[in-house]
Amino acid sequence: MNSRLLLEALQAAETHHASLFEEVRTRSVDIRSGMDNPLLTAHRIEIRQLADQFLAQPIEALPFSAFRLFQVNGSRKEFEKIYFDRRRRLAAFAIAALLEEDAAFIPALEDIIWAICDEYTWCLPAHLNVQDSEEEDDAPRHVDLFASETAHALSEICHLFKDRLDPQIVKRARHEVIRRVLNPYMQLKRVFGWETATNNWSAVCAGSIGMAAIYMIQDSRILMPVLNRVLEAMACFLEGFTEEGACLEGLGYWYYGFGYYVYFAELLKQRTGGRVDLLLVEKKAQRIAEFPQFCFLQENHVANFSDCGRTSGIQPGLFSRLCQRIEQLRIPSLSHRSNSIDHCGRFATAMRDLAWTDYALLKKREGLPLRSEFLQEAEWMVSRCQVNGKLFSFAAKGGHNAEPHNHNDIGHFVWIVDGVRWLEDLGAGLYTRQYFGDERYSILCNSSAGHSVPIINGCFQSEGEQYRSQVVEVGIQDGRDRFLLDLRQAYDVPHLHKLERLFDLDKQQGKLTITDSYDFTESPTSITERFITLYPPEVGKEGEIILSASDGQKLRLMYDARQLNAAIQTAEHLDHSGNAETVYLVDLKSVDTARQQVISMTLEPMF
């Protein structure tokens, strides 16, 4: 859409400004009147409990000692815990003030708005370049993910509560949004790095700024160039997805980035009276909306390649709106709902869970088929089947080792049986300076050492786009799935001429066989087949390793004991929340030094 058409669309609906996001007010009245909706009832109860908890606690200060820790030792969690609790408090009080009659929530909301306006910067220390004196001096006006989100939250609150908040609160909040975010964005003579990014940053930052601008700027002639710039960033965001709609950052970042794309798109649609509808005109966006159908493996378990959690709830507001817009969309089980306000206090998501959730529609769309699928550009394979009443899910990937939020994981896979993740992807680790710096691939969950892939001559996979796989064969049949990858280019190993990995899933018996075929120009010094699990393994009879779950379920890993020696070691993994986990590394080392070797291993449940 060109500038003239955008301006005409904005001007034609300029009088709609007062009714923006009116659906949240309507929904609040419905809930107070006794609307029967189990998802919204749970949402309301959770919000009320959180709001009451915050009412009993003072607003915690953001001390310099916490702010400087990232610069000193790379730690983020101390500052971010306080920072995000403030955003959770903001969201809880705003939603509680909409839903409840308790008069205490408005003064509490005013206090947290005032405290946020007092903050030195809305940007996280991890996103500030503290080595750049010019940027450090302008930290209050630096725009990152969370400065943008804060600007949107405050502008939306001012819009919804302008007649209930003290005028001084509204005036100050609007002033800070303009000073810290809108003016730097509108007046900057060079682009922010995230404006041309093809990851979640472009959508979250631009989408938040776009929504803040829609609320704050009524004059269409001033608003239009801001939204033009936002739309350019949104176009870059869509480029980061494969043509089939896959998000290589993982499902968590799909929720984050695409969520903000949808939030902005829907508000822009309202502001233009339906004349600009990104979800209608962007066909790729519709394919992106279907990505969770591929990613959810069973119940709340997901294919969690890259920096992604192993399980995920659904966001009922976002899914409701997408189901309204896309007829063929299916959703996973409603039994697993995301927290009403997440650990970062994402206001936009919590508000739209309130405003958009359509329980009846979600129930109609609930349930994913037991089928196998392949994403050609992403090189992801997913299989789902049922054997003897048990659900089996398998996911494997090719790709390359410079993907967004990359892990060195070419040829890696996940294996789940009836809710037990036997062969695991560790997912995202604890975010620190080191995690996104030169030490990234020394961290277990990012290195191929922490994935179920071979170790050749003591070498792990290398990072970089040149380290990649090639798909040789994909076979999807009623009783068997096959996925054959050429992994030769994933390793910087001299004399490795060929390495092919075949995944062969027998969907009649629930057996997965992995076969690695090697060809060297000189004899290898070592070949180790590594498997990653969180369940204690023990060597059973010859050629068997048994994994045991606490509920009594067991899995058998079978191999040729004449060809492979088994060894088991443990390692520690810090998950995304900083919790320590014991990881079991099951290594099957070849006793042979022949140049050509074929090694097969089979996984099967013990019924």
Model-derived segments and spans:
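Extreme N-terminal leader/anchor segments
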Residues: 1-47, 82-84, 92-98
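Extended, charge-enriched "interface" segments that sit outside catalytic cores
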Residues: 44-66, 84
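Carbohydrate-active enzyme catalytic cores, enriched for enzymes
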Residues: 258-422, 477
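Histidine-centered active-site/metal-ligand motif
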Residues: 200-202, 253, 405-412, 451
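CBM-like, beta-strand-rich accessory domains located in the C-terminal region of large
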Residues: 127-129, 333-345, 431-607
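An N-terminal structural lobe/cap that precedes and organizes the functional/catalytic core
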Residues: 66-73
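Aromatic-lined, polymer-binding surfaces characteristic
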Residues: 33, 40, 80-286, 290-293
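Catalytic Cys-His active-site segments of thiol-dependent hydrolases/isopeptidases
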Residues: 423-428
